[in-house]
């Protein structure tokens, strides 16, 4: 492998990195992946909206379809959903590999390899460590698809603790669960997750994923949830853990996601829904935009990568910003207020509106309407001021 063998090097072989490579129409592309197999380890609940599945190119790996959600606060519950399919549950190992196979028709892969950027006089180069061997490449473009804790973004000075927060996730796969396979279970209880929520996601055939996102030791919090929450205890009373996974989640907004000849995609760019933590929908859209902009650059139709920032911000930037504002309010609410919101919502006409117009991928807009419509005695001047 020579210094100038590739026009584009993508650091990270997850779905977004692979979609970026797939959408580069010209040039030689190398995808560098630190793990020895695509899709391992599991770092996602695998719940993807209908629109998200389309953005991902309708990959293989569906194990269940869901029609809605049971949303629980500490003492209240509301059921959202109707007869229509709202989302799909994926076996991520199968899905990720299917997307990677598509990318492999256009791109080369280097597995069990670690790539990092280094500054040189012409921009940035890539230094790769692969099976003890060090390789230096000088591509025209580098893509940082290296996830929530992106080293690429930090080295560029684009990512820091002020423009994003890193949360931890913990998840079990369990069998022998007694669950309604048509609905996801969401738990808004500060006892178990102070900064996000807890979930039970049915995979079909008595399998579930049980997880939470928060700061600190998520494992102990998840064990506590399973042992103490009355709904979880009933669903999981005969269940056994068959798999354990952890991950990281970036919540924030980057004003700039490129520098010189490097750009960031996916979790590295904070292309994540602030209210649910889902990163595949915005990530896939951003990856496609990145691939198209890189193609223009390689064709010398544009002089720099600024168009990438412009296009993703126009496409979904406002949804991330609004989601962060709603999340700021959400973090101020204790269990008593969450109970009040869920109880009021369960008795309101908004359920019909949500079932008809609700969009998993545009959560901020829906949340704003719901909170403004509910009279819960909080003086929602707070919400007005935030938005």
Curated annotation (Swiss-Prot):
<dbReference type="Pfam" id="PF01494">
    <property type="entry name" value="FAD_binding_3"/>
</dbReference>
<dbReference type="GO" id="GO:0071949">
    <property type="term" value="F:FAD binding"/>
</dbReference>
<protein>
    <recommendedName>
        <fullName>Uncharacterized protein MJ1520</fullName>
    </recommendedName>
</protein>
<dbReference type="InterPro" id="IPR050407">
    <property type="entry name" value="Geranylgeranyl_reductase"/>
</dbReference>
<comment type="similarity">
    <text>Belongs to the geranylgeranyl reductase family. ChlP subfamily.</text>
</comment>
<dbReference type="InterPro" id="IPR011777">
    <property type="entry name" value="Geranylgeranyl_Rdtase_fam"/>
</dbReference>
<dbReference type="InterPro" id="IPR002938">
    <property type="entry name" value="FAD-bd"/>
</dbReference>
<dbReference type="InterPro" id="IPR036188">
    <property type="entry name" value="FAD/NAD-bd_sf"/>
</dbReference>
<dbReference type="GO" id="GO:0016628">
    <property type="term" value="F:oxidoreductase activity, acting on the CH-CH group of donors, NAD or NADP as acceptor"/>
</dbReference>
């Amino acid at each position: 492998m020579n210094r100038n063998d590739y026009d584009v090097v993508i650091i990270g072989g997850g779905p977004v990195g692979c979609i970026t490579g797939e959408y580069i129409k010209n040039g030689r592309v190398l995808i560098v992946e630190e793990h020895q197999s695509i899709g391992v380890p599991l770092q996602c609940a695998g719940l993807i909206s209908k629109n998200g599945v389309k953005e991902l190119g309708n990959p293989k790996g569906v194990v269940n379809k869901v029609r809605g959600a049971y949303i629980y606060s500490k003492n209240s519950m509301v059921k959202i959903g109707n007869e229509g399919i709202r989302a799909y549950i994926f076996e991520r190992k199968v899905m990720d590999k299917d997307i990677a196979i598509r990318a492999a028709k256009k791109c080369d892969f280097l597995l069990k390899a670690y790539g990092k950027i280094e500054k040189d006089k012409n921009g940035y180069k890539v230094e790769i460590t692969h099976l003890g061997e060090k390789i230096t490449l000088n591509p025209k473009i580098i893509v940082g698809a290296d996830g929530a804790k992106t080293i690429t973004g930090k080295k560029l000075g684009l990512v820091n603790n002020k423009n994003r927060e890193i949360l931890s996730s913990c998840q079990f796969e369990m069998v022998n669960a007694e669950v309604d396979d048509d609905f996801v279970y969401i738990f808004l209880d500060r006892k178990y997750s102070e900064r996000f929520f807890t979930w039970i996601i049915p995979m079909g055939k008595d399998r579930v994923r049980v997880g939470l996102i928060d700061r600190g030791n998520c494992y102990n919090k998840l064990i506590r949830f399973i042992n103490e929450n009355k709904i979880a205890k009933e669903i999981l009373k005969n269940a056994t853990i068959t798999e354990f996974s952890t991950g990281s989640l970036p919540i924030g907004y980057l004003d700039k996601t490129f520098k010189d000849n490097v750009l960031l995609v996916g979790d590295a760019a904070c292309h994540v829904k602030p209210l649910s933590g889902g990163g595949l929908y915005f990530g896939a859209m951003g990856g496609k935009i990145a691939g198209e902009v890189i193609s223009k650059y390689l064709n010398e139709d544009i002089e720099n990568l600024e168009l990438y920032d412009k296009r993703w911000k126009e496409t979904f930037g406002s949804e991330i910003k609004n989601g962060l504002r709603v999340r700021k309010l959400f973090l101020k609410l204790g269990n008593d207020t969450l109970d009040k919101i869920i109880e009021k919502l369960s008795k309101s006409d908004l359920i019909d509106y949500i079932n008809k117009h609700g969009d998993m991928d545009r959560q901020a807009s829906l949340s704003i309407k719901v909170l403004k419509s509910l009279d819960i005695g909080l003086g929602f001047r707070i919400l007005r001021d935030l938005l």
